[in-house]
Amino acid sequence: GVHSGDATLVFPAQKIYFETARRIKKVSKMIAKELNISGPFNIQFLAKNNDVKVIECNLLASRSFPFVSKVLKRNFIETATRIMLDAPYTKPDKSAFDIDWIGVKASQFSFARLHKADPVLGVDMSSTGEVGCIGDDFNEALLSAMIAVGNRIPQKNVLVSSGAAKSKAELLEPCHMLAAKGYNIYGTAGTAKFLNENGISATAVCWPDEQGDLNIMDMFSKHVFELVVNIPKDHSKRELTNGYKIRRAAIDHNIPLITNARLASAFISAFCNMDEKDIQIKSWQEYK
């Protein structure tokens, strides 16, 4: 999995089952009551098919605390402090999450300064900063956040190395969107074969350790690609070596790199459905 500090956060949640959300609220109340918690606390949940499990509970305010405060326009630090001091406070309304805007928190990475480091995310936190952006809808908020941390919307050429079967299937619809928008899609052998078999024109490129006219490392040197989606597949020596070389080349040539299929899918869907020029410039106070 990916460390929660590196994950892209969407608030309020857009794709959680109603029953899952209900159970999360119920479990949170039970834990707070049983442990007699009066201040901020952080719970990490694992949810699948409405089955909710608690991974960990920490009696502290996470970095998402100020982000949530900004999105909901309520200073939860002040509220928590008042509760801990037994001072008067106003309870948040039950409809506090019913807002007409969405917040997205994206992580900032410094792999360009960490020479030879593998820019892939894992259980250890790698991000060195983050940004929070608000938009009228998910696409606007996500694009704003992704651009704010240094990503650029591609104009013509996208490289996709989609990894295992699950991530290939997850990236199929986004690749349909890219093709419909006129993008040139390049893929490693397995990905290109999968896309072509599913009606998407994709050009196969050679792995770094292969010889050919379309060697991927030569194409990086020529700055052919404007976005690289590289989903790690397995831990075989060849996959690890070639995958690392692709990811590192993207960073070294200052090309936006995404290594998570869900984030890649969301980002592609966002810029295919919304032009960068349509992103509104609004102050925080205008969201009301």
Where are these regions (language model features)?
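A general structural motif
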Residues: 138-143, 162-166, 185-187, 206-217
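N-terminal active-site wall of soluble small-molecule enzyme domains
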Residues: 166-177, 191-192
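Peripheral docking tails and interdomain loops at the edges
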Residues: 206-208, 215-288
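Glycine-rich phosphate/diphosphate-binding loops that line cofactor/substrate pockets in enzymes
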Residues: 147-158, 177-180, 219-225
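Short internal beta-strands
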Residues: 159, 182-194
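ATP-dependent carboxylate activation and anion-phosphoryl transfer catalytic cores
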Residues: 1-154
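Active-site rim loops that border cofactor/substrate pockets in soluble metabolic enzymes
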Residues: 156, 192-220
